[in-house]
Amino acid sequence: MRIGYGYDVHGLVPGRKLVLGGVTIPYDRGLAGHSDADVLLHALADALLGAAALGDIGHYFPPGDPRYKDADSMLLLREVYRHVQTAGYRLANADATITAQEPRLAPYIDAMRERIAAALGVTKEQISVKATTTEGLGFTGRGEGISAQAVVLLLDREAGAGL
């Protein structure tokens, strides 16, 4: 068993789509970044890599590399999980929290869980996504950006289905 933690943050800017957990969310701004800047998937990717001691997302997808300009982070997450599986692990479960003052994310959480589960080839019950605010405090509270944190539990791939 191995545990990993990931964190990501991006600023909100006009003229970009807001993509979280692979779901496009209607909003007047989106997240700044080289790829689609999906903070939830980036935090999840870092948690997966960390649990397997495989480095971080920037090692695999350097922010200045033109191949990843506006890249779909769901594809990056799938690639990360292939590395994790090659290292001999499989996902037991993931738990993630998005911190954003706006927009309201509750209506999109189920779709995020479904997209992430499908990308990783696991059940929706293995993926938890929550959203919270900072009650107006800090950069997320002022609406300057969105952050996400994720924790994963990996099991040896050869281990039985139960924990």
Curated annotation (Swiss-Prot):
Keywords tagged on the record: Isoprene biosynthesis, Lyase, Metal-binding
Protein residues bound to a divalent metal cation: 8, 10, 42
A GO term, aspect molecular function: metal ion binding
Pfam families from the UniProt entry: YgbB
One record GO biological process: isopentenyl diphosphate biosynthetic process, methylerythritol 4-phosphate pathway
Cofactor(s) named in the record: a divalent metal cation
InterPro entries: MECDP_synthase (IPR003526), MECDP_synthase_CS (IPR020555), MECDP_synthase_sf (IPR036571)
Binding site for 4-CDP-2-C-methyl-D-erythritol 2-phosphate: 8-10, 34-35, 56-58, 132-135, 139, 142
Pathway(s) it belongs to: Isoprenoid biosynthesis; isopentenyl diphosphate biosynthesis via DXP pathway; isopentenyl diphosphate from 1-deoxy-D-xylulose 5-phosphate: step 4/6
PROSITE patterns documented for this protein: ISPF (PS01350)
EC assignment: 4.6.1.12
Catalytic function, reaction form: 4-CDP-2-C-methyl-D-erythritol 2-phosphate = 2-C-methyl-D-erythritol 2,4-cyclic diphosphate + CMP
Cofactor note text: Binds 1 divalent metal cation per subunit.
Site (Transition state stabilizer): 34, 133
Top-rank taxon: Bacteria
Top-rank EC class of the record's enzyme: lyase
Coiled coil: none
Residue pairs linked by disulfide bridges in the UniProt entry: none
Function: Involved in the biosynthesis of isopentenyl diphosphate (IPP) and dimethylallyl diphosphate (DMAPP), two major building blocks of isoprenoid compounds. Catalyzes the conversion of 4-diphosphocytidyl-2-C-methyl-D-erythritol 2-phosphate (CDP-ME2P) to 2-C-methyl-D-erythritol 2,4-cyclodiphosphate (ME-CPP) with a corresponding release of cytidine 5-monophosphate (CMP).
Subunit and interaction comment: Homotrimer.
Assigned protein family: Belongs to the IspF family.
Protein name: 2-C-methyl-D-erythritol 2,4-cyclodiphosphate synthase
Origin species: Moorella thermoacetica (strain ATCC 39073 / JCM 9320)
Gene symbol of the encoding locus: ispF
